[in-house]
Amino acid sequence: MKRIIAPVAALTLAACSSLAFAQGDTLSFFITSVGSGDGANLGGLEGADEHCATLAEAAGVTGKTWRAYLSTHAADGNDAVNARDRIGSGPWFNANGVQVAANVDDLHSDNNMLSKKNSVDENGDQVNGRGDDPNMHDILTGSTLQGMAMDAGASCSNWTSNGEGSAQVGHHDRQGGGANPTSWNSAHGTRGCSQENLESTGGDGLFYCFAW
């Protein structure tokens, strides 16, 4: 029996190593498995980007530039930032090797492959959607349908507030309520910016991460 177990263990280890290599080689899109824990206060774009990189590295992915899919409005002398302009040019693949979009225009069209099945976290696990307990389908974006920045009041003070305000969110499962219920990036605004507010709307402070 021992002679059989050793080769099987070796094959299992090799398979796991191959899977990790494949994921690290292709993974360039995911939903964060956890948020900041402080509502929509992500530490600004810089803090959100760092969170993306930290989760990716924990999943075994290194050597890539990660950016959170988040927009900010013009403030304090700084120009507005559009989510679509900060995520690279594509293509993007999830942790299971599925190409979700070929380029920026494809991502913001009906041709993308974003869905509850394909919009997974950095480990390849599905994120709770409508009908699950708890529902966590509200994904922070602060963006329009085309990935552009919105007016002040749609990004919780440019992702630095956990108090009053609102953040525009999308539905990763492509269903629910709001002005654009099937939109992955611009379904509706939240009731506030605190963790409790986000959870009461149907989210958990999660956001999309893209890499190149």
Residue spans of the language-model regions?
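N-terminal signal peptide c-region/cleavage motif recognized by signal peptidases
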Residues: 15-17
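Cleavable N-terminal signal peptides
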Residues: 9-10, 20
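Secreted/extracellular ectodomain signature
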Residues: 21-212
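Bacterial N-terminal signal peptides that target proteins for export
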Residues: 1-8
